[in-house]
Protein backbone atom coordinates (compact mmCIF):
# COMPACT_ATOMS: atom_id res chain seq x y z
CA UNK A 1 0.00 0.00 0.00
CA UNK A 2 2.76 2.56 0.73
CA UNK A 3 4.21 1.83 -2.70
CA UNK A 4 1.01 3.04 -4.36
CA UNK A 5 1.10 6.31 -2.42
CA UNK A 6 4.76 6.84 -3.24
CA UNK A 7 4.14 6.24 -6.93
CA UNK A 8 1.12 8.55 -6.93
CA UNK A 9 3.13 11.30 -5.20
CA UNK A 10 5.96 10.90 -7.72
CA UNK A 11 3.46 11.00 -10.58
CA UNK A 12 1.97 14.22 -9.21
CA UNK A 13 5.34 15.85 -8.68
CA UNK A 14 6.89 14.85 -11.99
CA UNK A 15 3.98 14.94 -14.37
CA UNK A 16 0.68 16.27 -13.11
CA UNK A 17 1.46 19.64 -11.50
CA UNK A 18 3.96 20.97 -14.09
CA UNK A 19 1.67 19.98 -16.96
CA UNK A 20 -1.35 21.43 -15.21
CA UNK A 21 0.46 24.75 -14.76
CA UNK A 22 1.66 24.75 -18.36
CA UNK A 23 -1.85 23.93 -19.58
CA UNK A 24 -3.37 26.74 -17.52
CA UNK A 25 -0.84 29.24 -18.89
CA UNK A 26 -1.36 28.04 -22.46
CA UNK A 27 -5.14 28.09 -22.12
CA UNK A 28 -5.14 31.63 -20.74
CA UNK A 29 -3.12 33.14 -23.60
CA UNK A 30 -6.26 34.35 -25.41
CA UNK A 31 -8.47 35.07 -22.41
CA UNK A 32 -7.64 38.74 -21.62
CA UNK A 33 -8.88 39.88 -25.03
CA UNK A 34 -12.04 37.82 -24.66
CA UNK A 35 -12.77 39.09 -21.16
CA UNK A 36 -12.69 42.73 -22.22
CA UNK A 37 -15.08 42.20 -25.15
CA UNK A 38 -17.54 39.82 -23.54
CA UNK A 39 -20.51 41.16 -21.66
CA UNK A 40 -20.53 40.24 -17.99
CA UNK A 41 -23.13 37.78 -16.85
CA UNK A 42 -26.18 39.25 -15.15
CA UNK A 43 -25.98 38.85 -11.38
CA UNK A 44 -28.31 36.28 -9.90
CA UNK A 45 -31.43 37.54 -8.18
CA UNK A 46 -30.71 37.86 -4.49
CA UNK A 47 -33.24 37.09 -1.81
CA UNK A 48 -32.44 40.23 0.19
CA UNK A 49 -33.55 43.75 -0.52
CA UNK A 50 -29.95 44.86 -1.13
CA UNK A 51 -29.68 43.80 -4.77
CA UNK A 52 -28.47 47.26 -5.76
CA UNK A 53 -25.65 47.00 -3.26
CA UNK A 54 -24.75 43.52 -4.49
CA UNK A 55 -24.70 44.70 -8.10
CA UNK A 56 -22.46 47.62 -7.26
CA UNK A 57 -20.02 45.29 -5.50
CA UNK A 58 -20.05 43.00 -8.54
CA UNK A 59 -19.33 45.89 -10.87
CA UNK A 60 -16.62 47.12 -8.48
CA UNK A 61 -14.94 43.73 -8.68
CA UNK A 62 -15.32 43.80 -12.47
CA UNK A 63 -13.73 47.24 -12.69
CA UNK A 64 -10.82 46.26 -10.42
CA UNK A 65 -10.27 43.04 -12.40
CA UNK A 66 -10.31 45.00 -15.67
CA UNK A 67 -7.85 47.57 -14.36
CA UNK A 68 -5.58 44.82 -13.03
CA UNK A 69 -5.68 43.00 -16.37
CA UNK A 70 -5.18 46.16 -18.43
CA UNK A 71 -2.15 47.17 -16.38
CA UNK A 72 -0.18 44.39 -18.03
CA UNK A 73 -1.67 45.10 -21.48
CA UNK A 74 -2.98 41.60 -22.01
CA UNK A 75 0.03 39.46 -21.03
CA UNK A 76 0.33 38.66 -17.35
CA UNK A 77 3.31 37.39 -15.36
CA UNK A 78 2.78 33.66 -15.95
CA UNK A 79 2.29 34.13 -19.66
CA UNK A 80 5.52 36.13 -19.84
CA UNK A 81 7.24 33.42 -17.80
CA UNK A 82 6.07 30.69 -20.19
CA UNK A 83 7.08 32.72 -23.25
CA UNK A 84 10.54 33.43 -21.81
CA UNK A 85 10.99 29.74 -21.00
CA UNK A 86 10.14 28.75 -24.57
CA UNK A 87 12.50 31.42 -25.92
CA UNK A 88 15.28 30.09 -23.66
CA UNK A 89 14.71 26.49 -24.80
CA UNK A 90 14.65 27.51 -28.45
CA UNK A 91 17.83 29.55 -28.11
CA UNK A 92 19.64 26.57 -26.57
CA UNK A 93 18.25 24.28 -29.26
CA UNK A 94 19.53 26.66 -31.94
CA UNK A 95 23.11 26.66 -30.65
CA UNK A 96 25.67 26.33 -33.48
CA UNK A 97 26.11 22.75 -34.64
CA UNK A 98 29.57 21.18 -34.76
CA UNK A 99 28.95 19.25 -37.98
CA UNK A 100 28.35 21.22 -41.21
CA UNK A 101 26.17 18.43 -42.70
CA UNK A 102 23.82 18.55 -39.73
CA UNK A 103 23.49 22.30 -40.30
CA UNK A 104 22.33 21.85 -43.91
CA UNK A 105 19.73 19.27 -42.92
CA UNK A 106 18.25 21.44 -40.19
CA UNK A 107 17.84 24.65 -42.22
CA UNK A 108 14.02 24.40 -42.49
CA UNK A 109 13.81 23.63 -38.78
CA UNK A 110 16.05 26.61 -37.96
CA UNK A 111 13.87 28.90 -40.07
CA UNK A 112 10.83 27.68 -38.16
CA UNK A 113 12.64 28.24 -34.84
CA UNK A 114 13.65 31.75 -35.91
CA UNK A 115 10.08 32.60 -36.89
CA UNK A 116 8.80 31.28 -33.56
CA UNK A 117 11.47 33.22 -31.63
CA UNK A 118 10.59 36.38 -33.54
CA UNK A 119 6.88 35.96 -32.79
CA UNK A 120 7.44 35.22 -29.10
CA UNK A 121 9.82 38.13 -28.60
CA UNK A 122 7.31 40.41 -30.34
CA UNK A 123 4.66 39.22 -27.88
CA UNK A 124 6.91 40.24 -24.99
CA UNK A 125 8.05 43.59 -26.35
CA UNK A 126 4.96 44.79 -28.21
CA UNK A 127 3.08 47.60 -26.46
CA UNK A 128 -0.57 46.82 -26.86
CA UNK A 129 -3.17 49.45 -26.14
CA UNK A 130 -5.21 48.51 -23.09
CA UNK A 131 -8.84 47.79 -23.76
CA UNK A 132 -11.21 50.46 -22.53
CA UNK A 133 -12.94 49.48 -19.32
CA UNK A 134 -16.62 48.92 -19.82
CA UNK A 135 -18.33 50.57 -16.90
CA UNK A 136 -22.00 49.81 -16.54
CA UNK A 137 -24.25 52.45 -15.04
CA UNK A 138 -25.47 51.73 -11.54
CA UNK A 139 -28.99 50.32 -11.41
CA UNK A 140 -31.73 52.70 -10.38
CA UNK A 141 -32.81 52.29 -6.80
CA UNK A 142 -36.47 52.81 -6.11
CA UNK A 143 -37.18 55.06 -3.14
CA UNK A 144 -39.17 53.43 -0.34
CA UNK A 145 -42.89 54.09 -0.60
CA UNK A 146 -43.39 54.73 3.09
CA UNK A 147 -42.04 53.33 6.31
CA UNK A 148 -44.01 50.56 7.93
CA UNK A 149 -42.98 48.24 10.72
CA UNK A 150 -43.95 45.18 8.70
CA UNK A 151 -41.76 46.29 5.77
CA UNK A 152 -38.85 46.93 8.13
CA UNK A 153 -39.21 43.48 9.76
CA UNK A 154 -39.49 41.92 6.31
CA UNK A 155 -36.25 43.58 5.21
CA UNK A 156 -34.28 42.89 8.38
CA UNK A 157 -35.54 39.41 9.21
CA UNK A 158 -36.03 38.23 5.64
CA UNK A 159 -39.70 37.52 6.23
CA UNK A 160 -41.97 37.95 3.23
CA UNK A 161 -45.72 37.79 3.51
CA UNK A 162 -47.64 39.33 0.66
CA UNK A 163 -46.67 41.12 -2.54
CA UNK A 164 -43.19 42.66 -2.86
CA UNK A 165 -44.29 45.91 -4.46
CA UNK A 166 -47.62 47.62 -4.35
CA UNK A 167 -48.32 47.74 -8.08
Curated annotation (Swiss-Prot):
Its main location: cytoplasm. InterPro entries: SecM. It comes from the Bacteria. One of its GO terms (molecular function) is translation regulator activity. One of its GO terms (cellular component) is cytosol. The keyword Signal applies. Keywords: Cytoplasm, Periplasm, Signal. It is found in: Cytoplasm, Cytosol; Periplasm. The keyword Cytoplasm applies. Residues 1-38 form the signal peptide. It holds the Pfam family SecM. Regulates secA expression by translational coupling of the secM secA operon. Translational pausing at a specific Pro residue 5 residues before the end of the protein may allow disruption of a mRNA repressor helix that normally suppresses secA translation initiation. Belongs to the SecM family. NCBIfam families: PRK02943.1-1. This is Secretion monitor. It comes from Cronobacter sakazakii (strain ATCC BAA-894). The lineage of its organism: Bacteria, Pseudomonadati, Pseudomonadota, Gammaproteobacteria, Enterobacterales.
